[in-house]
């Protein structure tokens, strides 16, 4: 088997230290911690009150509101970081051979925020129509959808 050469040409990052690679790197070299009080949900009933949350993230920097509503937060991070990496590599995707560009992405669980919102919403609905899920529930939640969104761009 012949091994193929892989080249990393650009980097992007969305982290608790910053929403860009330079912000993240600056935090790392200055010994900054990304930990802080949990703000994404009510954690008052949990022993742990601190987490490393991404703060100040705006998905509208890379997509419109309608498109963003179809994605879970983890996918929005992935799409934004990929856009940063493409920009960092100074790639013009219109001029590149897309058959020579790949996306490698890993996620342990996928859209847990979407899952949580849908399950809680399902339990609360008590009308004549009955409970229903958002039509984007499964597409927003599956763990490989972030790579799909990146690839479609």
List the model feature ranges, each with a label.
Residues 1-153:
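Conserved "HGTGT" condensation-loop signature of ketosynthase/thiolase-family condensing enzymes
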């Amino acid at each position: 088997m012949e091994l193929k050469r892989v080249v990393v040409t650009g980097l992007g990052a969305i982290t608790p230290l910053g929403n860009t690679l330079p912000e993240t790197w600056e935090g790392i070299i200055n010994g900054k911690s990304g930990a802080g009080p949990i703000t994404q949900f009510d954690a008052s009933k949990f022993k742990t009150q601190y987490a490393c949350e991404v703060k100040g993230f705006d998905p509208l920097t890379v997509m419109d509101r309608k498109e963003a509503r179809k994605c879970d937060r983890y996918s929005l991070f992935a799409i934004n970081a990929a856009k940063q990496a493409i920009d960092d590599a100074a790639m013009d995707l219109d001029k590149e051979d897309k058959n020579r560009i790949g996306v490698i992405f890993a996620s342990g669980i996928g859209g847990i925020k979407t899952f949580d919102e849908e399950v809680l919403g399902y339990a609360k609905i008590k009308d004549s129509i009955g409970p229903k899920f958002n039509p984007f529930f499964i597409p927003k939640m599956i763990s490989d959808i972030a790579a799909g969104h990146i690839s479609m761009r």
